[in-house]
Amino acid sequence: MKKTLMLLAMVVALVILPFFINHGGEYGGSDGEAERQIQAIAPQYKPWFQPLYEPASGEIESLLFTLQGSLGAAVIFYILGYCKGKQRRDDRA
């Protein structure tokens, strides 16, 4: 119980602390920052290819990014759960 409360407090701190550390800061994605850095280093650079699908808005782009991350996490945790269950089954036999 004590360990659970400590872990929960750490998670809450990790979620809330960034709001106080970077209060009033601007959130920018890594793609935009990478584009700015490339333009600063090599202004003549031309991309090798264009995206197959360009989302209509930033909200849709965020939704797709979140869905991709959620699906990846689901696959990873399914595999971990499967392996853990298989290990328990083998230990009982």
Swiss-Prot record:
GO biological process entries: cobalamin biosynthetic process
Broad class of the protein's primary localization: membrane
Residues that span the membrane, as ranges: 5-25, 63-83
Alphabetical UniProt keywords: Cell inner membrane, Cell membrane, Cobalamin biosynthesis, Cobalt, Cobalt transport, Ion transport, Membrane, Transmembrane, Transmembrane helix, Transport
Pathway membership: Cofactor biosynthesis; adenosylcobalamin biosynthesis
Subcellular location: Cell inner membrane
InterPro entries, per database record: CbiN
Membrane topology, from the record: Multi-pass membrane protein
Any GO molecular function: cobalt ion transmembrane transporter activity
Transmembrane among keywords: yes
Cellular component terms (Gene Ontology): plasma membrane
HAMAP family given in the database record: CbiN (MF_00330)
The protein's assembly and partners: Forms an energy-coupling factor (ECF) transporter complex composed of an ATP-binding protein (A component, CbiO), a transmembrane protein (T component, CbiQ) and 2 possible substrate-capture proteins (S components, CbiM and CbiN) of unknown stoichimetry.
Function: Part of the energy-coupling factor (ECF) transporter complex CbiMNOQ involved in cobalt import.
Protein family: Belongs to the CbiN family.
Protein name according to UniProt: Cobalt transport protein CbiN
Taxonomic classification: Bacteria, Pseudomonadati, Pseudomonadota, Gammaproteobacteria, Enterobacterales
